[in-house]
A protein has these predicted regions:
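Bacterial lipoprotein signal-peptidase II cleavage site
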Residues: 31-39
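Short glycine/serine- and small hydrophobic-enriched flexible loop segments
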Residues: 100-105, 154-164, 219-223, 286-290, ...
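Substrate-binding cleft of extracellular glycoside hydrolase catalytic domains
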Residues: 129-181
Length: 367
């Protein structure tokens, strides 16, 4: 049985409920039944000794108004919790991962340590993955044990970077455990490809899988393969590249926030979600650029170039099926991605919205 997520986000609802749903008490149902979309086998054998990874330096992240100090001053609680100001002050594994990556590149060991300690004690599951959400208004605050694979990837990447930079073997060990857990619990083999699932539960059933192209954080995946070339990340990278070259739809050949893959290889925008190049998919060109894969960013770049040439604003989303666009402009975070990939000047002030600010700072990274 699959848990189907909502097609639209009601006003006031946490955006990540759109992709996760509350699965508490239903996990046994999710893993039951026969399906041709099967979870990938658990990795076995010893974990190779980590290879040296590049050591981040402060020069590899922005300074001034768009920087880690500015971001942490606005969104980091002293406890180490990154606060999503756009979603009722919740926290999630994604935000913890973004914050930890930023702090590592900025050389802020104290903040990194606080964020990891909060994440470890609050979200870490026994299997090495992270519960995806912390809601201070809920009882208990962590009430959905499902993970968010992009959050796991970001945290594992940050731990690997920081463990190397600050010579912390425990962080490297935890990074390795998270990588193995991702491969064993958050991937699916379908249509002859091994692909990242958005979460362990609720996204693969009956020979189909719902996937999120923006969960391919290329600098992180490359770092995983470099640290542990025997774990299988080369396959994830190769098959993820295939996915992103195929997940192009409509007049402008843009990726959508969510796609559905069938066992025969048919790929389409996820039918139970809006067919938008929007909130999630804007990270596809960002991660492609940061990961040295400009070809994967090209459709978005060409679309944005066309908008500029026509003297039009960059819309918050475009419907790839109808061509309709949002009647409001993209956020400062998207504008920062456009400046990174197309050229031009990015917004000079950090947004007061968590997600837009994340995108702004990420666009300054030079992994």
């Amino acid at each position: 049985m699959a848990i189907r997520v909502r097609a639209a986000v009601p006003a006031g609802m946490d955006r990540r409920l759109f992709c996760m749903g509350a699965l508490t008490g239903m996990l046994s149902a999710c893993v039951g039944g026969d399906s041709s979309a099967t979870a990938a086998p658990t990795a076995t054998g010893p974990t190779p000794s980590p290879a040296p990874a590049p050591t981040p330096t402060p020069a590899q992240i922005g300074t001034g108004a768009i920087s880690w100090p500015a971001f942490s001053g606005a969104f980091l609680d002293p406890s180490g919790r990154v606060v999503d100001t756009g979603n009722n002050l919740i926290s999630h594994s994604e935000g913890q991962g973004y914050g930890m990556v930023m702090a590592c590149y900025a050389g802020d060991r104290d903040a990194f340590g606080r964020m990891w300690e909060w994440t470890r004690t609050t979200l870490l599951r026994p299997d090495g993955l992270l519960s995806w959400r912390y809601d201070p208004a809920a009882t208990p605050p962590v009430n959905d044990p499902n993970n968010a694979t992009d959050g796991d990837i970001l945290v594992a990447w940050a731990l690997g970077l920081a463990g190397t930079r600050w010579n912390q073997p425990d962080w490297l060990t935890q990074a390795a455990a998270m990588r193995v857990a991702i491969l064993s619990k958050a991937t699916v083999t379908l249509a002859g490809r091994r692909l990242l699932l958005p979460a362990e539960f609720g996204f693969a059933t009956d020979g189909r899988a719902t996937l999120n192209p923006a969960y391919y954080v290329w600098p992180a995946l490359d770092a995983f393969h470099k640290l542990a070339p025997g774990e299988g990340w080369d396959t994830i990278i190769t098959d993820g590249t295939w996915l992103l070259t195929q997940a192009r739809f409509g007049q402008h050949q843009l990726p959508t926030d969510w796609v559905e893959l069938a066992a025969d290889g048919t790929l389409r925008p996820a039918p139970d979600r809006s067919p938008w190049f929007g909130f999630d998919a804007v990270r596809v060109p960002l991660y492609a650029q940061l990961g040295g894969r400009s070809g994967l960013a090209r459709p978005a770049v060409e679309y944005w170039q066309g908008q500029r040439a026509a003297g039009q604003t960059i819309p918050a989303w475009i419907d790839v099926a109808s061509g309709a666009t949002a009647d409001y402009a993209a956020s400062a975070g998207v504008e920062a991605i456009v400046a990174l990939t197309v050229g031009g000047t990015a917004p000079a002030a950090l947004s007061d919205d968590y997600y837009a600010a994340v995108l702004q700072v990420l666009a300054t990274l030079r992994p």
